[in-house]
Amino acid sequence: MDKAVTLSEAVASIPNGAHVALSGFAITRATMAFAAEVLRQGIRDLTVSQCVGAMDADLLVGGGAVSRILYGGGSLDRFGRLACVNRAIEEGSIVAEEYSSLSMVFRYLAGALGLPFVPIRSLRGSDVLTHLQEVAPSATAYVDDPFTGDRWLALRPLNPDVAVIQVQMADPEGNAWIYGPRWDNEEQVKAAKRTIVITEQLVPTEIIRRDPERTVIHGFRVSHVVHLPFSAHPTAVYRAYDYDADHIRLYAEAAKTPEGMRAYLDKYVYGVKDHWEYLELLGGMRHLTRLVADPVLGY
């Protein structure tokens, strides 16, 4: 079944108030074009979850689309903090459930396996857990090991309404390859009710079938496939393109203040009709070709 659609069509399938799991990790494989389209369509009151908060989540928060975030902390890596997320937390405009990265993966894993809860040693005795129990008291509990009697922290499973995963290659049926680190993406997909795949390359199914062990997302879990080159810009996609350091610096500086963020959104999100106009605004292929990955190094 051919599931290839436009980005606009895929985003339109997400209702207000949905829980969306994002594949991004700091400044790598972040779902940036997706986040921008969510803002252009005016979708609101989202719950966003990630193992490590990335630039896509910060953009969504900066645009007012998020009411709750579940994450293991996050940053723009060497370029600084997630300024919009941090400001929203300080202002109280979003609820932040902060976990360790491991415990976020465990919550997705529990959801993927259909478990009622998952025991974990992580978080015990930390201020992270103390704060988490204040903002999300139903997310954790304590259980006794029936074999040893030991006391364990238990986490509630996560089952996002949709996982949005940025990949390097997919076929029209939704079978997808991810090169390089996959982090929690497989657990996100298996835990979610459905998945939107955003791919740099769209290839015939015959290509995927030639090397089936590379397939980490299987088509039966996928509702939409979006073929959109440079859709993670300005973040990096291994073996496709490197991060755009100049643009991330521009974003990081703009995001420091509400006024700066509004100006950024007006120019790069609301000032263009779609991802293609955004790429042209950056300078088109004259600008993007310098980011294309070295075929040997992968970046």
What spans do the regions from the language model cover?
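Conserved alpha/beta enzyme-core scaffold
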Residues: 1-299
